[in-house]
Every structure is written in structure tokens, then in C-alpha cells.
Swiss-Prot record:
NCBIfam families: murE (TIGR01085), PRK00139.1-4 (NF001126)
Residues reported to bind UDP-N-acetyl-alpha-D-muramoyl-L-alanyl-D-glutamate: S32, T159, T160, S186, Q192, R194
Stated name of the protein: UDP-N-acetylmuramoyl-L-alanyl-D-glutamate--2,6-diaminopimelate ligase
Gene Ontology molecular-function annotations: ATP binding; magnesium ion binding; UDP-N-acetylmuramoylalanyl-D-glutamate-2,6-diaminopimelate ligase activity
Keywords: ATP-binding, Cell cycle, Cell division, Cell shape, Cell wall biogenesis/degradation, Cytoplasm, Ligase, Magnesium, Nucleotide-binding, Peptidoglycan synthesis
Taxonomic lineage: Bacteria, Bacillati, Cyanobacteriota, Cyanophyceae, Synechococcales
Post-translational modification comment from the UniProt entry: Carboxylation is probably crucial for Mg(2+) binding and, consequently, for the gamma-phosphate positioning of ATP.
Any one biological process term the GO annotation gives: regulation of cell shape
Length: 503
């Protein structure tokens, strides 16, 4: 892929005098370490370092030109002879827009659905991908676990990639024949303009609960970042569709700001603040084997059966079905496909070992709301005791730590407090931050070593008991200081279950 530099600038509305209008670029990157000869470098301001200060390194490595922000230009001013272009912030906006033009605006060539929210993004996107496959729609998935499209699958590095990579991925998916794409979009990605240049045909709001306040500083700022997905320029046009969870107070507020193309979703048929949901469920029967009921939409209703565990997963299912109906898929075609969806790795994933053993599940729940939903869901799973093994991540929102402790002690019969990804924080201090939330009468074990903590909980549990290992889910690593080690809750739990069965 090649593009004339002056034409690229012109296409996004940047008017600059460029000496040598025949300059050609063949790639776009925001990583000065990996910029290739003939590439266009974007220096993005970061939380710790402004990437714009590396423009000299990028040019020395063969970049045709560099695009940087005003602060970087003040720190290391380029001369008139340097092929450096200073743009207004956010620089990431211009990178996304130019990368989109460079790759021939790939998101405009498919139906692209964005899914945002604190919890439920991964399950909702996986459901959409599954339902597309069952309906014969060639799709692409971009998210926390994997990025995949026909004949391609790769482990994701970020929930949402930066614009230089994201637009390339979209172009590859389009070239591979994808007709519909579904993308997890984090609040960081929206705030940092990683999805600039994307054109979404639809958007889904799952919920908004406390998380990332170390980054956003307030729930209002967190909400405003999420809301960016539901307005121009990200939503394609006024007729672009959306599905919003109005059981969530932030979702209810968002729905009032949107047009008639927004479908409001609720788990019950009820009027909420004068709003009647377009999507809702009735006749629910929730058991430890799954859920069944009747799904209602503006295009009819019908029965469904799902193997997903927990009431909270119903909203993920309802919104996935709703957004696909809005994209022209028949409700009657979608309903039978719900039953065959087996779930997402690390999301209420049961560790299966044959024998007279406790039930052990691994879940990614790492927020107060996520942990509460998981524990409440497991109460219907059996009549035995409920064990909870959890910790809190280091270098992240500290205010949620005592809240997590309070929820664990309220909804579990036994709590094992341990490390999550401590990162550069003192693991003991993280546990100390959690402890004020845990009631004094709680049956509690404190064990910093996560593997030992998992073993202690499983060994203490009896057949008929349930052990929830929360926080890390699908992750196959643990971050200790600046080191990342191999660590998988699922593998450790399986090993301990075998040990318990054959001591």
C-alpha cells in the first residue's frame, strides 16, 4: 500500500506546504522503535512519555515524515528543513483518520458494531460473533482476548488497538471477506482516540460501574468517555443503530440522549423513568444449568435457551440479539443459535475434573459490580458453601479495593484474599487496602501467594461447595513488579483438583 503524503494530509483536512509533493509513504506507525523506511511516524503523547520527542529517531530510521503534537515540538523544536508536521491535539485523532484513509476507509466497507461498558464487553462481542457464524455471516472480532477474521487469529495485546494497527486489522478483515465486524472498545480507547477514523454502524452499551477511576478521576468523566461511541463522528450517521442497557442508571441517562434508532434493553417488561424498553425478557427460569425464557423485540418474540450462568449474562445476550436484529438478522434465526453458545474463556469458566469434587470456576470479575454479579449467580449453582478467592490489581483504582472486600464478605461464605497483578505496588499494602471492607465475622484466609491461595481454598472446599477464583480470568500471566511470569488460574486449579482427587 502506497500513498502520496500531501494527498493523505489533504484527505483529512490538514493543509500544509509540503516540499516535494511526490513523497510516498508505505506504512504508518506510532512506534519509533519499529518504524520502517518509507513510513509515516506519529508521536503520541502518553501518560509518562510523549512519543513525539522521538521524531528524530524515527526520521533517522527511515521515516518519510513525522507528525507530532505542540508540546513535543516545544521540547525539541524541528527546523524548517525537518520533515516534521506539528498538529493540534489529540495527535491520535489525526493518526486514526490518516490510517483510515491510507487503508481505504475499511470500517466503511463493512457493518461495524462497537461494544463498550465496564463489564460484559467480551461476552457480548463473542455472542455477536457466534450468532453471526450460525447465521452464515462472515465476521471479524476485535477484543480483549483475540483479534480474528477468516483464516486469521492472533492474541490481542490491548482491548482496543491503537489507530495505526487497528485500521490495518480492519483492512485485513475486509480483504478476507468479513461482512460484519464487532469490536470491544474500552474507555481508555475512546478517551485516547484509538478508534478515530472508524465508522460504526451500531453501538452497544453494557453498563457502567466503578472502575478505572485512577485514570478518569470521576464517574462523570468515565461516562463521558463511553458516550463518545454513541455520537458523531464515530457513529456513521443519524440512522446508525444502538442498544443500551437501561437497567443501568448511566445507560438510562445515555438512552435519553440518543435518537429513535436506539433500542432500550431491560431484563423485565417495565417502564423505567417513563421509558418503555424495546427489548425485554419474560418467563425466565434460571438454574445451575443455564437460563430459559422468552425474548421480546420490536420484530417479534420467541423462546430461548442459554447455557450461560447468571442473570447478568442475560443482558449480554439480549443486547447481542438486539443489535443483530437492527442489522437485518431475523429474530427467529437468532434464537435457536443462543443455545449452542458455550461461553468465553475465563468468564464463569468451570474447571472440569471428573470425581467427587467441589465445583471450581474462574472468572475475570475484577470490579465491585462484576464480583457481586458472579457471586450472586453462583448462589443458584448449588446448596453448598461459596468460596471466593480474589485480589485487586496494583497501580490501578485504589478506591474500589475496600468495596471489593465488602462484596466478597457479604456474598461468599469463605473469603481467601490474595494477590492479583500487584505490578509495582507492595502486595501486602494492596491487601491492607481491601481489609477495611471485609466484615470482622467473615471466615477469612489471607495468602499473598496466589497459587497457594487457590490451593488452600480448593482443599478446604467439600463436594457440593463452589469455589470462585476471581480477577484474572483468561490471563496466562501474573505481573510482579516489572516482571511478568507465567500464571494461569485455570491450569493451577485443574492441577489442584487432580491432587485433591489423588493425594
Amino acid at each position: 500500500m502506497n500513498y502520496q503524503l500531501h494527498e493523505l494530509f489533504k484527505a483529512v483536512g490538514i493543509h500544509r506546504q509540503i516540499v516535494g509533493k511526490d513523497l510516498i509513504i508505505d506504512s504508518i506507525s506510532c512506534d519509533s522503535r519499529h518504524i520502517s523506511k518509507g513510513g509515516l511516524f506519529f508521536g503520541l503523547p502518553g501518560e509518562k512519555v510523549d512519543g513525539g520527542i522521538f521524531w528524530r529517531k524515527a526520521l533517522a530510521s527511515g521515516a518519510v515524515a513525522a507528525v507530532i503534537g505542540e508540546e513535543a515540538a516545544q521540547k525539541d523544536p524541528p527546523s524548517n528543513e525537518d520533515m516534521v508536521f506539528v498538529v493540534s491535539d489529540p495527535v491520535a485523532h489525526w493518526m486514526g483518520e490518516m490510517a483510515s484513509v491510507f487503508w481505504k476507509r475499511p470500517s466503511s466497507q463493512i457493518d461495524l458494531i462497537g461494544v463498550t461498558g465496564t463489564n460484559g464487553k467480551t461476552t457480548t462481542t463473542y455472542l455477536i460473533e457466534h450468532l453471526c457464524k450460525q447465521s452464515g455471516i462472515t465476521s471479524a472480532l476485535f477484543g480483549t482476548l483475540y483479534n480474528r477474521w477468516p483464516k486469521h487469529s492472533e492474541v490481542a495485546i490491548h482491548t482496543t488497538a491503537f489507530g495505526d494497527v487497528l485500521q490495518s486489522q480492519l483492512a485485513q478483515a475486509v480483504a478476507a471477506g468479513a461482512r460484519l465486524g464487532v469490536m470491544e472498545i474500552s474507555s481508555h480507547a475512546l478517551d485516547q482516540r484509538r478508534v478515530a477514523g472508524c465508522s460504526f454502524s451500531g453501538a452497544v452499551f453494557t453498563n457502567l460501574t466503578q472502575d478505572h477511576l485512577d485514570y478518569h478521576e470521576s464517574m462523570e468523566a468515565y461516562f463521558q468517555s463511553k458516550a463518545l461511541l454513541f455520537q458523531a463522528p464515530l457513529l456513521r450517521d443519524k440512522e446508525s443503530c444502538s442498544v443500551v442497557n437501561i437497567d443501568d442508571p448511566w445507560g438510562l441517562r445515555l438512552s435519553k440522549q440518543l435518537n429513535k434508532s436506539c433500542w432500550r434493553a431491560s431484563l423485565e417488561k417495565r417502564v423505567i423513568d417513563s421509558i418503555q424498553p424495546e427489548l425485554f425478557l419474560t418467563d425466565l427460569n434460571i438454574t445451575n444449568k443455564g437460563i430459559e425464557g422468552v425474548l421480546h423485540s420490536p420484530f417479534g418474540q420467541g423462546p430461548f435457551v442459554s447455557s450461560l450462568i447468571g442473570r447478568f449474562n442475560l443482558m449480554n445476550m439480549l443486547e447481542a440479539v438486539g443489535i443483530l436484529i437492527q442489522h437485518g438478522v431475523s429474530l427467529q434465526e437468532l434464537l435457536p443459535s443462543i443455545k449452542s453458545f458455550s461461553g468465553v474463556p475465563g468468564r464463569m469458566e468451570q474447571i472440569k475434573v471428573e470425581g467427587d469434587l467441589p465445583v471450581v470456576l474462574v472468572d475475570y470479575a475484577h470490579t465491585p459490580d462484576g464480583l457481586k454479579n458472579a457471586l450472586i449467580a453462583l448462589r443458584s449453582f448449588g446448596s453448598g458453601r461459596l468460596f471466593c478467592v480474589f485480589g485487586c490489581g496494583g497501580d490501578r483504582d485504589r478506591s474500589k479495593r475496600p468495596l471489593m472486600g465488602a462484596i466478597a464478605s457479604k456474598f461468599a461464605d469463605h473469603v481467601t484474599l490474595t494477590s492479583d497483578n500487584p505490578r509495582t505496588e507492595d502486595p501486602q499494602q494492596i491487601l491492607n487496602d481491601v481489609l477495611p471492607g471485609i466484615a470482622t465475622e467473615t471466615e477469612l484466609i489471607i495468602e499473598i501467594d496466589r497459587a497457594n491461595a487457590i490451593q488452600m481454598a480448593i482443599m478446604k472446599a467439600l463436594p457440593g461447595d463452589i469455589v470462585l477464583i476471581a480477577g484474572k480470568g483468561h490471563e496466562n500471566y501474573q505481573i510482579l513488579g516489572l516482571e511478568t511470569i507465567e500464571f494461569d488460574d485455570r491450569e493451577i486449579a485443574k492441577k489442584i483438583l487432580h491432587l485433591k482427587l489423588n493425594p
